Amino acid sequence: MPSSPITVGLVFGGRSGEHDVSIRSAATVVRGLRSGENTERYTVQPIYIDRDGRWWGTDLAEATLTSEVAPELTTPRPPSGFQGFPEGCDAIDLWYPVLHGPNGEDGTIQGLFQLTGKPFVGAGVLGSAVSMDKQAMKSAFSSAGLSQVPYVALHASELEDAKSRSALLDRIERELNYPCFVKPANLGSSVGISKVRSRQELEAGLEQAAALDPRLVVEQGVNAREVECAVLGRRTLEASVIGEVRFDADWYDYETKYTAGRSTTLIPAPLPDPVRDRIREQALQACAAVGVHGMSRVDFFYDETNDQLWINEINTLPGFTAQSMFPMLWAASGVTLEQLVHKLIQTAGE
């Protein structure tokens, strides 16, 4: 145990659509850092980023963590965006980002932390950026030989005129069958995703996604179980037990993910041991393919009728809310919340 506590700069909130989820995740992480032996190991210095990108120091950050909702900000306010670190940040020994979506898990803030010369929890710039962009991620998975559902990658510019739009719709319908899913390439938590069953719905879904991100992906829908594996470590990666998500909805959208009672998690997932082993092995392969270390949650589709396993995506800053798989998977693997956040900080220093 260190002679003096390590000061952890816990950064949360952010400009993405997952702002509220980040607050709830951060509150859980802080509980872990302020419990048991961690109270002697760490001093937590929270930093809140508001929806306009302003960085706020300890007083507002602590109040936000206590309420677990975004605060009402006073006026006049400082200019929006990053204007420098809040007072007292020079004492921070290590950064712990609890940020979801753009500017949080896409390599942006990881680059800022790297410039400070201090270690930080989670994946680095490259792994974060590749994992956040679904087009880049899918290319990396393909190069690693990992099976994926059929998909079409495209750019919003292909929707700009009637001729190219029609050609795009024709190409998607030629390569994929309905239903399919239209996704912005760089958003998380199912934000901006739509399930489409016709050409009219496809066109509307593309318009909706293109308003959020110029890079888009359309994926073939499959009738499969949704299973997940958590990964932890830096020099040596460990894979958790496997979990399964079952939900009371047509698909696993944002509301279903974050509304209590709308989804059910089965941990461990009721799967044959050989299938569990394949999932764990492919989760580690996925991390290697995109250059991810620290922590991640890797999501798969499994069709038990033909024993087909497809990798879906990797999340480099998975949620830590009450409904979040990552901490629950590790708890089922024998790692408590207190131990988990400690391990994550240890990996940052390796």
Swiss-Prot record:
GO terms for molecular function: ATP binding; D-alanine-D-alanine ligase activity; metal ion binding. It comes from the Bacteria. It is found in: Cytoplasm. Its main location: cytoplasm. Binds 2 magnesium or manganese ions per subunit. Keywords: ATP-binding, Cell shape, Cell wall biogenesis/degradation, Cytoplasm, Ligase, Magnesium, Manganese, Metal-binding, Nucleotide-binding, Peptidoglycan synthesis. Its cofactor is Mg(2+); Mn(2+). The keyword Ligase applies. GO terms for cellular component: cytosol. It is an enzyme of class 6 (ligase). It catalyses: 2 D-alanine + ATP = D-alanyl-D-alanine + ADP + phosphate + H(+). Belongs to the D-alanine--D-alanine ligase family. Cell wall formation. This is D-alanine--D-alanine ligase. The gene is ddl.
